[in-house]
């Protein structure tokens, strides 16, 4: 019998459409191409409601957080999100402190929409700004300019309890001065959370086909150090690989991922992880919005499903938990995986000998070296079929 303690449960809702597909983006996002956005919104929202209606597992567990991601969720009206939040509230039960986040693109800002999002219960906004530099915005093919980014951020900070600003570094031909200017502009907005992502060239993207010149690994590391030092000086805590927060504004939804919590994925391509008394299982919805829409009415929206093996649980827990700079409590590993900590004794010893992790007061956490070489650290916990450490 699987006896893992049931973790917090979150809901992720995917809105797959955007105005323009950025050249670096490998997410499940699709440009509107001559389609009626309003009609598309209605059809897709009804499909999301249908999937929620057909979600009959663990409906008595409280919902820890809701996250509307994309794509560009801010293309949809407050009325659509109101329907979805109400359906989740009826189907499940919202935690008293439920964090409800919407991702927004500064190029799609509608003031009435922003006010409406707040009115329907959304209390956190994540703005995909990426840069305040006009040259870099054009290179990244963002649909907003610097002023639109500033206006959107100031409006969001005024309206919402918590606001995250997404920024990128190691951009094509980016200088240290340009990066410092981006950081300073972000700090002037006075948001309580900043996410900083290294630009990576992913397969199946425009940048992969036509690679721009980007800073090399050493130059990227220097830029990262500049970011971390500047944000720490400004009272931000670097709590996760790419995330900085102050005043207790860490993202509850993402922390649930990193702590190997459970989540239900609603919408095209959305993934789920669910713990039960028998097992931990993962499943995902069909990725193509068109195919997803055609299958929802048949209650056939699940593409694949699998039960996590012991090796899966070990690697997936560590892959998530070691992203958090404060690491994890030993008893959390045991609660979330239903495995004794001795299951990974050999791997922990190897990681300690390489000075990639340390154990302090019952917590296992990555060292500064481990944070810098996270991929190498995670490889230690990736086993082959014979349970041998790779």
Residue spans of the language-model regions?
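Basic, amphipathic "hinge/linker" alpha-helix immediately C-terminal to the N-terminal HTH DNA-binding motif
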Residues: 364-371
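Short amphipathic alpha-helical interaction segments
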Residues: 338-350
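Short active-site neighborhood of thiol/selenol oxidoreductases, capturing the structured segment around
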Residues: 11-15
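A short, conserved structural fragment
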Residues: 353-362
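Local cysteine-cluster metal-coordination motifs and their immediate loop/turn environment
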Residues: 16-29
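Short, Lys/Arg-rich nucleic-acid/phosphate-binding segment
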Residues: 244, 361-364
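C-terminal scaffold of the Radical SAM
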Residues: 6-8, 29-55, 61-339, 389
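Short, amphipathic alpha-helical interaction segments positioned at domain boundaries
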Residues: 371-390
């Amino acid at each position: 019998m699987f006896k893992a303690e049931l973790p917090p449960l979150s809901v992720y809702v995917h809105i797959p459409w955007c105005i323009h597909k950025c050249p670096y983006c490998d997410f499940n996002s699709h440009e509107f191409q001559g389609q009626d956005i309003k009609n598309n919104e209605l059809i897709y929202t009804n499909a999301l409601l249908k999937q929620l209606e057909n979600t009959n597992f663990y409906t008595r567990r409280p919902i820890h957080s809701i996250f509307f991601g994309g794509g560009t969720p801010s293309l949809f009206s407050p009325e659509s999100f109101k329907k979805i939040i109400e359906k989740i509230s009826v189907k499940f039960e919202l935690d008293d402190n439920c964090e409800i986040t919407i991702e927004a693109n500064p190029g799609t800002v509608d003031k009435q929409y922003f006010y409406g999002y707040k009115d329907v219960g959304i209390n956190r906004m994540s703005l995909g700004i990426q840069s305040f530099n006009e040259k870099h915005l054009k290179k990244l093919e963002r649909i907003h300019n610097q002023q639109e980014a500033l206006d959107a951020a100031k409006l969001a900070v005024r309206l919402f309890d918590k606001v995250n600003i997404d920024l990128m570094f190691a951009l094509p031909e980016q200088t240290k001065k340009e990066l410092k200017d981006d950081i300073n502009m972000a700090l002037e907005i006075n948001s309580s959370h900043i996410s900083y992502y290294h630009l990576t060239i992913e397969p199946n993207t425009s940048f992969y086909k036509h690679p721009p010149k980007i800073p090399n690994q050493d130059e990227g590391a220097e830029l990262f150090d500049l970011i971390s030092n500047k944000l720490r000086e400004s009272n931000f805590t670097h709590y996760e690989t790419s995330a900085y927060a102050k005043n207790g504004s860490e993202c509850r939804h993402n922390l649930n991922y990193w702590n190997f919590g459970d989540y239900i994925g609603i919408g095209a391509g959305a993934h789920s992880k669910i713990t039960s008394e028998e097992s931990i299982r993962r499943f995902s919805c069909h990725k193509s919005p068109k195919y997803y829409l055609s299958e929802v009415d048949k209650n056939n929206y699940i593409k694949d499903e699998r039960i996590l093996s012991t090796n899966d649980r070990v690697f997936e827990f560590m892959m998530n938990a070691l992203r958090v700079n404060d690491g994890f409590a030993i008893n959390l590993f045991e609660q979330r995986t239903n495995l004794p900590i001795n299951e990974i004794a050999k791997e922990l010893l190897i990681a300690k000998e390489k000075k990639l992790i340390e154990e302090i007061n019952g917590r296992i956490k990555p060292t500064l070296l481990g944070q810098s070489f996270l991929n190498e650290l995670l490889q230690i916990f990736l086993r082959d079929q014979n349970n041998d450490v790779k």
